[in-house]
């Protein structure tokens, strides 16, 4: 905590919430390195449902207060932009995600030879891609980007009052290009994430039962300007990743998945589907950095500016300022939903964990199909499942529920 600010707990709020929203002096190196400044001061938001002390850059203070006023107005006027606060269940989910992201990293496991070998293996696989980043105008014309123009523009929607990406696209392109050199110099886009809620229907099991169950979950909306820059690398990489990586499920049809499963069952003796707990929000910064180093291996021959832009994308992905219903959180770990990298980084991290732990436990023959934290692995050999889960938790800081995981004999 900054000197002079008492660490008090708001009514009904856990003590770690305050630590999550404050930024200790000992950790201000990030701002000196990436933003070139360390002029932080507290902002008090008495409109939050739980009074909380939060921080923002002094230069951004007026802007933040204006945005909070607009968010408050949207809540009262029931505008199309969704803002959580009505449902205690959703608020609890948001608090759990942000509290987990605010926890310290688990100790780095980079020193381990099995992990180093797994990382080198994935990088070698990506080196076959030989990709090049897109320019901003080309990103806006891709099918991946065009099909999402009706979705929310993130923080920019509150700035302009226009909800969708399509309504903000021209202005976002202009602003992203104008600020690119400054963003790269700071190694950060300085665009906060906004918490929203998404309601969707469940799938096959509900269809069989004749009912459609709605599921509401929080998501973190990335600013459109940052998304445009991230997509310069993300769009070409995701397209290649989904069509060339054998262990990635993305892009496969149901028939292809069934065909893969049928073949794997005839070749291996056992199968395993691991259930991770709080997978996205538990990922340490060093693990995310290494996952992005795997991505970078697919882009050989980057010039100095492109190297800086990629580092800016990684830095902004890891070190996040999140505007929630109860204040501003600053976190330095975890993967966010609503990002172009969400599926890719989650899947690469899953693969890194799996290859490392299987190597440690002597499992040499296996095949996997992974999609983020979900996956199905067929393998030969004897695997101590309890030890398998405990090693993942110990070395990667991600909890595994073996009671919810499914496994069995393939024959």
PLM feature segments, named:
Residues 1-411:
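Viral RNA-dependent RNA polymerase
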């Amino acid at each position: 905590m900054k000197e002079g600010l008492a660490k008090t707990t708001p009514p009904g709020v856990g003590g770690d919430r305050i630590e999550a929203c404050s930024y200790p002096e000992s950790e201000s190196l990030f701002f000196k390195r990436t933003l070139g400044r360390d002029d932080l001061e507290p902002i008090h938001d008495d409109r939050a449902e739980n009074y909380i002390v939060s921080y923002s850059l002094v230069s951004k203070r007026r802007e933040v207060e204006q945005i909070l006023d607009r968010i408050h107005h949207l809540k009262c006027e029931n505008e199309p932009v969704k803002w959580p606060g009505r449902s205690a269940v959703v608020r609890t989910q948001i608090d759990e995600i942000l509290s987990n992201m605010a926890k310290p990293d688990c100790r780095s496991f980079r020193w381990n030879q099995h992990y180093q070998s797994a990382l080198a293996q994935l990088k070698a696989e990506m080196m076959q891609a030989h990709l090049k980043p897109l320019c901003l105008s080309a990103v806006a014309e891709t099918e991946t980007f065009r099909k999402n123009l009706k979705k929310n523009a993130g923080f920019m929607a509150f700035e302009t009052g226009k909800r969708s990406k399509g309504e903000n696209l021209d202005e976002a392109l202009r602003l992203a290009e104008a600020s690119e050199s400054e963003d790269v110099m700071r190694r950060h886009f300085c665009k906060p994430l906004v918490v929203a809620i998404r309601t969707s229907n469940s799938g096959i099991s509900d269809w069989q039962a004749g009912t459609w169950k709605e599921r509401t979950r929080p998501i973190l909306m990335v600013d459109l300007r940052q998304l445009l820059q991230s997509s310069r690398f993300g769009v070409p990489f995701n397209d290649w990743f989904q069509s060339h990586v054998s262990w990635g499920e993305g892009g496969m049809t149901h028939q292809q998945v069934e065909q893969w499963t049928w073949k794997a069952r005839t070749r291996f003796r056992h199968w395993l589907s691991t259930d991770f707990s709080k997978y996205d929000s538990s990922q340490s910064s060093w693990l995310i950095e290494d996952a992005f180093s795997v991505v970078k291996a697919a882009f050989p021959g980057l010039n100095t500016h492109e190297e800086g832009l990629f580092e800016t994308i990684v830095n902004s992905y890891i070190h996040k300022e999140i505007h929630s219903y109860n204040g501003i959180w600053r976190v330095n770990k975890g993967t966010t939903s609503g990002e172009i990298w969400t599926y890719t980084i989650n899947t690469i991290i899953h693969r890194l964990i799996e290859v490392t732990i299987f190597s440690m436990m002597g499992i040499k023959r296996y095949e996997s199909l992974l999609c983020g934290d979900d996956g199905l692995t067929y393998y030969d050999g004897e695997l101590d499942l309890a030890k398998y889960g405990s090693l993942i938790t110990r070395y990667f800081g991600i909890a595994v529920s073996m009671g919810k995981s499914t496994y069995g004999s393939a024959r």
